[in-house]
Amino acid sequence: KELKADNKPFDEAQIREKVRAEQKTEQSKFRDAAKTRATSESKQNTLQRITAAFGTTCGKIGILIAMACVIGRCMLASGAAERIVRAALSVVGVKGAPIAFCSSSFLLGIPVFFDSLFLLAIPLVKATWLKIKKNYVLFVVALVAGGTMTHSLVPPTPGPLFVAEELGVNLGTMILAGMAIGLFCSASGLAYAYWINKRMDIPLRESPEEMKKLEELAERDINELPSLGLALLPILLPVALISGVTIYKSGLDPTITIHPALNLLGDKNIALTLAAALAMLLAASRLKDRKLLAEHVQQAMMEGGLIILICCAGGAFGAMLQQSGIGPHISSMMGSEPLDFTLLPLAFVVTAVIRGAQGSATVAMFTAVAIVGSLVTDLEALSFHPVFLAVAIGCGSKPFPWMNDSGFWVISKMSGMTEKETLKALTPMATIMGLTGIIVTMIAAKLFS
C-alpha cells in the first residue's frame, strides 16, 4: 500500500480524496490549456486560421474522396455494382432477396455514396418484386439498412473518413471496426424490415411504360455484366491493402521496421488510387466508346470536388468550434470528473441531436467530432481505443431522419412511397440501427479496453 510521510498506510477515504484531487488537477490543466490556446489563436488573423484549417482538412482527405468518387462512378458505369447485387440474389434466391439486398448494399456502400447506390439498386428491387408481387417494403427497407450503415461507419465515405482523421484513428482500424459494428446495426435494421413489412402492404406504383422497362431489366443477360471477381476487385483491394497492413503492423515488435514497399501499398492514398485505376480499366473494357469513360471520370471529379469543398468547410468550422473554447465550457457543465467512458454516449447524443436538427448525417458527424474532440486533451489517455469514439459518432448520425434529410426524399421519390409511409418505414429503422450501434460499441469498448 502507498504510505504517508509517517509510514502509515492511507485509509480508503483518504485514497478516494487523493484520487479526486488528482482528477480535478488534471481537469483544471486541460481547461487552462484549452483557454490559453483559444486566446493565443484568437490573436491571429481569423481568415488565416480558417484557411489553414481548410487546407489541413483537404490534405488529409482530398485524394481519398476524389478516388472514392471515381471508383463509385466507374463501378456504376461498368455494371460491376449491378453484378454484385445480382450475384447476391442468385445465391439466396427470391425468398432470400432481403438478405441479398442488405448484404450487397452494405458492401457497395463502402465505395459508392448512398444516394447513387439507392438509385442504382431500386430498379433491381422493383424488378424482383415483379416476380412475386409482394414484400416491396421489405425489399426497400432492407436495401437502406445495408448501405446507410457503411455510409456512416466505413471510410472512404466522407463522414467516417473525416472523423477518423480528426481523432487520429488509423484508416484500416476504422474500416475493420466500422464493418464489424455495422454488421450488427444492419442486422437490427433488417429485423425491423421484416417486422414493418407485415404491417405495411404497399404496391409498386409505376406506369405501364416503366413496368415494361423493369421487366426487361429483370430478364437482362448476366453475361452482359463483368465477372463477379472483377466486380469485387475495386472494393476488396483497398480494404485488403489498408486493413492488411494495419493488422500486420499490430502484430509486429515495435522495433521491427516494415518493408517500404508494403508500407507504400498500405498507404490509404495509394490503395485508393490503385482501386480507382482498376475501376477505370473495368469501365473501359465494358464501355463501347472510350469517350464515355472520360465523361464518367469527369463527372466523378465534379462530384468529388463539391464533396471535398463541403468536407473542408466542415473541417474549418470544426476548428473554429475548438478554438472558441467550447470544450472547457461543456466539460465544466459535466462536472469535475474527467470524461472517459461517458464520452461514448455523449458523442452519440450530440451527433443525434445535430442530425435531427439539420438533416445531414455527414454534417452532423463533422460538427460532433469538433465538439467531442475538444473535450479530450490526450486520446491515448482514454481507457478505450479512439476508434470506438469515432464509431459512436457514426452511430449517432443515424437516428431521427425525416423531411430535412436529402436521403429521405431520394428514398421516398424513387421508391414511390408517400412521405408518411417513408417516415413510418425509415425513421424507426434508422433510429434502431443507431441505438444498436452505440450499445455494441460500448460493449466492445469495455471488452477491448
Where are each of the predicted segments found?
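Hydrophobic core segments of alpha-helical transmembrane domains in multi-pass membrane transport
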Residues: K1, V19, I65-G72, S104-L108, ...
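Re-entrant/interfacial helical elements at transmembrane boundaries that shape
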Residues: C69-V70, R83-R86, S116-T128, T157-L167, ...
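Hydrophobic alpha-helical transmembrane segments of multi-pass integral membrane proteins
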Residues: G62-A68, V91-L124, C311-G314, E337-L375, ...
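Hydrophobic transmembrane alpha-helices of multi-pass solute/ion transporters
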Residues: K1-M67, R83-V91, L241-A313, H329-E337
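Alpha-helical transmembrane segments of multi-pass membrane proteins
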Residues: V94-G109, I132-S152, G172-M179, L183, ...
